[in-house]
Amino acid sequence: MGGDLTVKMLGGQEILVPLRDSMTVSELKQFIAQKINVPAFQQRLAHLDSREVLQEGVPLVLQGLRAGSTVLLVVQNCISILVRNDKGRSSPYEVQLKQTVAELKQQVCQKERVQADQFWLSFEGRPMDDEHPLEEYGLMKGCTVFMNLRLRGG
């Protein structure tokens, strides 16, 4: 395809992204993350003309984007929390209260190098369900979520 896609931020700054036919929203977000140091999970992208939010996993060209198109980037605000692992070590995580427990678990998986099915999270003594948003648990800036390993055996 060739050509560039323009990503425009609310502050007016713009970045140019080399566009490929097969490029997906996830790949675009990774490119943006490298350029402006905003994690992919904090990014919301919309087609500037239609104002439609771009769909994950769908090639950009199938969403009406081509060389010369402009995408609007909105950065979602985050809070910083701690996750304490089974060894008692706490690590900081940047999260949005709208994201699900499963999304936080994916962040933990990457940092702790453990599979999602090998642990569960709890906050203030309550187990956290994967499908529920973090806001349901009353998380606040600086709070600690606990990582609990699943027991093996029978």
Curated annotation (Swiss-Prot):
Function: Ubiquitin-like protein which plays a key role in the innate immune response to viral infection either via its conjugation to a target protein (ISGylation) or via its action as a free or unconjugated protein. ISGylation involves a cascade of enzymatic reactions involving E1, E2, and E3 enzymes which catalyze the conjugation of ISG15 to a lysine residue in the target protein. Exhibits antiviral activity towards both DNA and RNA viruses.
Superkingdom of the source species: Eukaryota
A biological process term (GO) from this entry: modification-dependent protein catabolic process
Domain Ubiquitin-like: start-end pairs: 2-78, 79-154
Region annotation Involved in the ligation of specific target proteins: where it falls in the sequence: 150-154
S-nitrosocysteine PTM positions: C78, C143
Keyword Cytoplasm: yes
GO MF term (any one): protein tag activity
UniProt entry keywords in alphabetical sequence: Antiviral defense, Cytoplasm, Disulfide bond, Isopeptide bond, Repeat, S-nitrosylation, Secreted, Ubl conjugation pathway
Tissue-level expression: Expressed in endometrium and uterine flushings of pregnant cow. Also secreted. Not detected in spleen, liver, corpus luteum or muscle.
UniProt site (Interacts with activating enzyme): R150
Signals that turn on the gene: By type I interferons.
Protein name according to UniProt: Ubiquitin-like protein ISG15
Residue span of motif LRLRGG: 149-154
PTM annotation, UniProt: S-nitrosylation decreases its dimerization, thereby increasing the availability as well as the solubility of monomeric ISG15 for its conjugation to cellular proteins. Induced as an inactive, precursor protein that is cleaved by specific proteases to expose the C-terminal diglycine (LRLRGG) motif. This motif is essential not only for its conjugation to substrates but also for its recognition by the relevant processing proteases.
Compartments where found: Cytoplasm; Secreted
Residues annotated as signal peptide: none
Cross-link entry Glycyl lysine isopeptide (Gly-Lys) (interchain with K-? in acceptor proteins), positions: G154
Subunit relationships: Homodimer; disulfide-linked. Interacts with, and is conjugated to its targets by the UBE1L (E1 enzyme) and UBE2E2 (E2 enzyme). Interacts with NEDD4. Interacts with PARP12; this interaction inhibits PINK1/Parkin-dependent mitophagy.
Free-text note regarding domains: Both the Ubiquitin-like 1 and Ubiquitin-like 2 domains are required for its efficient conjugation to cellular proteins. The two domains play different roles in the ISGylation pathway: Ubiquitin-like 2 domain is necessary for the first two steps allowing the linking of ISG15 to the E1 and E2 enzymes while Ubiquitin-like 1 domain is essential for the final, E3-mediated transfer of ISG15, from the E2 to the Lys of the target protein.
Assigned GO CC terms: cytoplasm; extracellular region; nucleus
